[in-house]
Regions:
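N-terminal leader/auxiliary helical segments
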Residues: 2-105, 110-224
Length: 224
């Protein structure tokens, strides 16, 4: 079980942040807010603070400096995190708060994979990377309130062939990321890629988790 370092008053101790990290955090928090609103899950509403924390937690660890969240270098780690999450649920001892925090972590990695500077095809400088992250912060905050973003989640929700196991999820991530690498990249397009991927992945993971533990309440529309 993952643990954070806390003080006597329950304060979360986090490493000092760079301006780049602050910009990344705001983009991830905007995405998390969108997913919370669209999923319409009472359980997530109860544990949304944990989901928000998970969505920024990977950027708040020293490991981020030496192991940036790039598909080529961290995808295997993400797969392990997802498999560990399912095992945690299957153990029957999983806590809802921890499950939603870990789901937030998964969303963080997926969002980074579909952010241009986090891929080997990006050949810009560190300054270019920071400027892209700055623009992404503003673009994501705006995009999640558009009709296009709302339509994406609804389309994913109604889509046939919902993901039912981790093999299907991994296949989808890998295929979609390969397509993404061959596409034109800009901030607006990245926002759409991220929203599409995270919407489909979150719906799929909730499907898998609810089937792994029948005590968990499925979403009202999940098996409609």
């Amino acid at each position: 079980m993952e643990r954070e370092t806390v003080g006597s008053r329950g304060d979360l101790y986090l490493p000092a942040e760079t301006e780049e990290n602050k910009m990344r955090k705001k983009s991830h928090l905007s995405l998390a807010a969108y997913l919370i609103g669209e999923l319409e899950s009472e359980q997530l509403d109860r544990h949304k603070k944990a989901f928000y924390l998970g969505s920024i937690l990977p950027d708040l660890t020293p490991k981020m400096i030496t192991s940036p969240h790039e598909f080529q270098t961290s995808y295997r780690e993400l797969q392990e995190k997802i498999c560990d999450l399912i095992s945690y649920v299957q153990s029957g001892e999983g806590k809802e708060r921890v499950v939603w925090r870990r789901l937030g972590v998964v969303m963080h990695y997926l969002a980074d994979y579909f952010t241009f500077p986090h891929n080997t095809v990006f050949d810009g400088s560190l300054k270019d990377h920071c400027l892209y992250e700055r623009d992404m912060k503003h673009a994501m905050r705006t995009y999640i309130h558009t009709g296009d973003a709302r339509m994406i989640f609804e389309a994913q929700r109604m889509r046939k062939g919902q993901i039912t196991n981790v093999s299907e999820l991994f296949a989808y991530i890998e295929k979609t990321h390969k397509t993404y690498l061959g596409a034109v990249h800009d901030v607006k397009d990245d926002c759409r890629w991220i929203v599409e991927m995270c919407s489909w992945a979150l719906i799929g993971l909730v499907n898998i988790i609810c089937k792994a533990d029948e005590k968990l309440q499925p979403l009202q529309w999940m098996y409609a």
